[in-house]
């Protein structure tokens, strides 16, 4: 019997018109923002942020590239796994949704499903939210009969680590000449204090990658803070401002939370932080591409799936 694999990611608007409803879906997720009158507030916040966010996507070509890149990953994984598996894509906050992916598998008579969120490090706000949405989808589709296996993380998988090491080596000829700046998506400190393992797992990922570059100095920083309150520190822009004072001239920026391109990489890192680095006088600002279909990364996904069977 064929098994189903759902590759899950955040999702992104596929047009400028989709920006506001995408933001509404994001801000109405109780696993990220637990607020009173959440849906009403989400509608207001989405409307307030839509114009600025649309501008980001205009600069990126009018849409997020994430769905197409996740499809490429699904195709590459499908080729590795062969005909005993059916690999589909389900997004958390935009089309095709996780429910759409499950529906596609059910139509083929598949009753064993492996969930593979493309978040290397576990957080209740990402992987946890995806799992909760899957359970709601399963109930809505009356699919309680199916067997489900969940892959929670792969932050320390040897092939995932090797993929990043190779990606770095392909980005610059002499990595030892650069200061490595790992930029991870930030989270509210409150979540970490409540036991979310994201920060600890991110630090472990960085440590394992750096075993391949023992002579290189590095910093882990956090980007993309949303709203108020205390978030993980130091922030990426703060680190960029501080390193130049320590006579660092060449930065190699590694988007450690991401396996495909997002607004966080294409706009924040490539535009905002690159411009900041240029203004501050850095000689070089090299941003390592996300893993996408890096062969070692696809091998890591293949291994994760096969070890769950």
Curated annotation (Swiss-Prot):
<keyword id="KW-0963">Cytoplasm</keyword>
<keyword id="KW-0456">Lyase</keyword>
<protein>
    <recommendedName>
        <fullName>Ferrochelatase</fullName>
        <ecNumber>4.98.1.1</ecNumber>
    </recommendedName>
</protein>
<comment type="similarity">
    <text>Belongs to the ferrochelatase family.</text>
</comment>
<dbReference type="GO" id="GO:0006783">
    <property type="term" value="P:heme biosynthetic process"/>
</dbReference>
<comment type="pathway">
    <text>Porphyrin-containing compound metabolism; protoheme biosynthesis; protoheme from protoporphyrin-IX: step 1/1.</text>
</comment>
<dbReference type="InterPro" id="IPR033644">
    <property type="entry name" value="Ferrochelatase_C"/>
</dbReference>
<feature type="binding site">
    <location>
        <position position="185"/>
    </location>
    <ligand>
        <name>Fe cation</name>
    </ligand>
</feature>
<dbReference type="InterPro" id="IPR001015">
    <property type="entry name" value="Ferrochelatase"/>
</dbReference>
<dbReference type="GO" id="GO:0005737">
    <property type="term" value="C:cytoplasm"/>
</dbReference>
<keyword id="KW-0408">Iron</keyword>
<keyword id="KW-0627">Porphyrin biosynthesis</keyword>
<keyword id="KW-0479">Metal-binding</keyword>
<dbReference type="GO" id="GO:0046872">
    <property type="term" value="F:metal ion binding"/>
</dbReference>
<feature type="binding site">
    <location>
        <position position="264"/>
    </location>
    <ligand>
        <name>Fe cation</name>
    </ligand>
</feature>
<dbReference type="InterPro" id="IPR033659">
    <property type="entry name" value="Ferrochelatase_N"/>
</dbReference>
<dbReference type="InterPro" id="IPR019772">
    <property type="entry name" value="Ferrochelatase_AS"/>
</dbReference>
<comment type="function">
    <text>Catalyzes the ferrous insertion into protoporphyrin IX.</text>
</comment>
<dbReference type="GO" id="GO:0004325">
    <property type="term" value="F:ferrochelatase activity"/>
</dbReference>
<dbReference type="Pfam" id="PF00762">
    <property type="entry name" value="Ferrochelatase"/>
</dbReference>
<keyword id="KW-0350">Heme biosynthesis</keyword>
């Amino acid at each position: 019997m064929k098994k189903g694999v759902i590759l899950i990611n955040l999702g992104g608007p596929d047009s400028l018109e989709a920006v506001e409803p995408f933001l509404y879906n994001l801000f109405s997720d109780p696993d990220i923002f637990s607020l009173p009158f959440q849906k009403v507030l989400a509608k207001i916040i989405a409307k307030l942020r839509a114009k600025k966010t649309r501008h980001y996507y205009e600069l990126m070509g009018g849409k997020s590239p994430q769905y197409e890149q996740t499809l490429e990953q699904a195709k590459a994984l499908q080729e590795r796994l062969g005909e005993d598996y059916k690999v589909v894509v389900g997004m958390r906050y935009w089309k095709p949704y996780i429910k759409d992916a499950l529906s596609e598998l059910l139509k083929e008579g598949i009753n064993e499903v492996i969930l593979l969120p493309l978040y290397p490090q576990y957080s209740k706000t990402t992987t946890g939210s995806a799992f909760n949405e899957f359970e709601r989808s399963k109930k809505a589709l009356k699919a309680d009969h199916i067997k489900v296996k969940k892959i929670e993380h792969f932050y320390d998988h040897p092939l995932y680590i090797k993929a990043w090491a190779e990606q770095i080596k392909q980005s610059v000829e002499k990595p030892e000449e650069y200061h490595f700046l790992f930029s991870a998506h930030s989270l509210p400190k409150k979540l970490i204090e409540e036991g979310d393992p994201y920060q600890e797992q991110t630090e472990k990922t960085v440590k394992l990658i750096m075993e391949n570059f023992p002579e290189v100095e590095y910093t882990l920083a956090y980007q993309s803070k949303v709203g108020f309150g205390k978030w993980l520190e130091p922030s990426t822009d703060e680190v960029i401002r501080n390193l130049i004072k320590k006579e660092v001239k060449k930065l190699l920026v590694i988007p450690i939370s991401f396996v495909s391109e997002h607004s966080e990489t294409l706009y924040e890192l490539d535009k905002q932080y690159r411009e900041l680095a240029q203004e501050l006088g850095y000689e070089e600002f090299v941003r390592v591409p996300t893993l996408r279909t890096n062969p070692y990364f696809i091998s890591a996904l293949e291994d994760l799936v096969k070890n769950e069977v």
